[in-house]
Amino acid sequence: MDYIDLLALHKINNLRLHLTDDEAWRLEIKSHPELAEVGGFRGGDSPIWPRYGKWNERWGGYYTQDDMREIIAYAAVRNIEVIPEIDLPGHSLCMATMHPEILCNYEPNKSRAFGYDTRSAFCPAKEANYELLDDILKEVCELFPTSYIHIGGDEVDMSQWRRCPDCQAFMRKNGMANESELQRYFMSRLTEILAKYGKQPAVWNEAIEGGKLANDTRVY
């Protein structure tokens, strides 16, 4: 809450919360509790490997939905809008630890990563991925009163899509010239999900390299 007070002091009226990344998942999703209950911790017996810090002890944490409602209310009194970011389609290594089915269909080279699977991006060719993300984004949209939900779009390792036979077949079928167009398709599907729940997308600028998204997209 101290950070929110500092934002108010400096008349900054937006707080973007980066709630997911390769390293952790920090928001409770009731339809998929494993995301935070497992993905919010690392070390010890956790399947999430620590990048820094303790290896022998389990540590971490996440925001419950009640926690987040308290933060949103505290910020609103100070005229600050809280915008959540669910970073997609890349930066999903943590989520893939619990849901490996989201990944592209090829055998990763683990020898360069000490046995650790470094695939970190959703496979845009898998229809089931959009069903999973619909579950997640529905709860995010219901929880946050903001008009905008940030859906990421940055730093996607597209070499994974180039190696994926499903992605390549999907691109050929749909006349896509490159993987940036495949990312545009993925982000457009998420935009449709958000629109269904009355929200607009915010993205990083890399998300529009494959072409224009919806007119109401906020680009950072």
Which positions does each model-derived feature cover?
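Catalytic-core regions of glycoside hydrolase
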Residues: 154, 158, 165-220
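Aromatic- and acidic-residue-enriched carbohydrate-binding clefts of CAZyme catalytic domains
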Residues: 23-77, 92-131, 159-180, 184
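Conserved, mostly hydrophobic/aromatic
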Residues: 7, 82, 133, 151, ...
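Active-site groove signature of glycoside hydrolases
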Residues: 87-88, 107, 114, 118, ...
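Short, well-ordered coil/turn segments that N-cap beta-strands
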Residues: 11-13, 76-80, 145-149, 195-200, ...
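Generic structural signal for well-ordered alpha-helices
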Residues: 4, 68-72, 86, 133-141, ...
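Catalytic domains of carbohydrate-active enzymes, especially glycoside hydrolases
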Residues: 2-22
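Active-site beta-loop-alpha junctions enriched in small/polar residues
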Residues: 20-24, 87-91, 154-156, 206-208
